[in-house]
Every structure is written in structure tokens, then in C-alpha cells.
Amino acid sequence: MSRSSKKGPFVDPKVFFKVQKAAETGSKEPIKTWARSCTIVPEFVNVTFMVHNGRQHIKVLVTEDMVGHKLGEFAPTRTFKGHGGKGKR
């Protein structure tokens, strides 16, 4: 079930404040965050985030196509090792 439209998108206030501060100073340094549930808003475009995946931080450069998605969608948490095959028997 999706979030109620009357509530609007969830944006972590700390992340939003850091993006605004970086825009004012013109900083291009990545913003480190653990807020995977934060929705990407248009103010985040062309900002680099370091999103935590449970083990390390993954670098994510936000583009216009990502607006409306969550930051955590672009930092996978599970490593796919592949299905069984001839080499795994």
C-alpha cells in the first residue's frame, strides 16, 4: 500500500537540510546517509549521496529519472552469487 497522497512524500529533514546547505555553499562532496526510506525530490537532482546498504556506503548520483523513488532503491542490500551450475556441483 502506498503512502496517502494528502500526506505528501516522506523526506528526511536532516537529509533535506544537508542538501540545502550544500546547494548554498556549492559543495560537490557526497552526502553520507543511512536514510534509505527518504523519497527523492527535485531538489536532490545532481547531488551525490553515499547510501548505506547495511555493510558499506554506495555512491548514488541522483538524476531526474530518480525523482519520486526512494534512496534505498539504488543501493542493493543483497549480493547475488548466482544459481547453481556445473561449477557449483
UniProtKB/Swiss-Prot annotation:
Query: What GO terms describe the biological role, i.e. biological process, of this protein?
Result: ribosomal small subunit assembly; translation
Q: Supply the alphabetized keyword list.
A: Ribonucleoprotein, Ribosomal protein, RNA-binding, rRNA-binding
Q: Which domain of life is it from?
A: Bacteria
Q: Which GO terms describe its cellular component?
A: cytoplasm; small ribosomal subunit
Listed GO MF terms: rRNA binding; structural constituent of ribosome
Give the coiled coil ranges. Answer: none
SUPFAM superfamilies, alphabetized: Ribosomal protein S19
**Signal peptide (UniProt feature, chain positions):** none
Read off the InterPro entries from this record: Ribosomal_uS19, Ribosomal_uS19_bac-type, Ribosomal_uS19_CS, Ribosomal_uS19_SF
Q: Which NCBIfam families match?
A: rpsS_bact
Task: Describe its function.
Answer: Protein S19 forms a complex with S13 that binds strongly to the 16S ribosomal RNA.
Q: What's the family?
A: Belongs to the universal ribosomal protein uS19 family.
Instruction: Spell out the HAMAP family in the cross-references.
Output: Ribosomal_uS19
Q: What is this protein called?
A: Small ribosomal subunit protein uS19
Organism of origin is Rhodopirellula baltica (strain DSM 10527 / NCIMB 13988 / SH1)
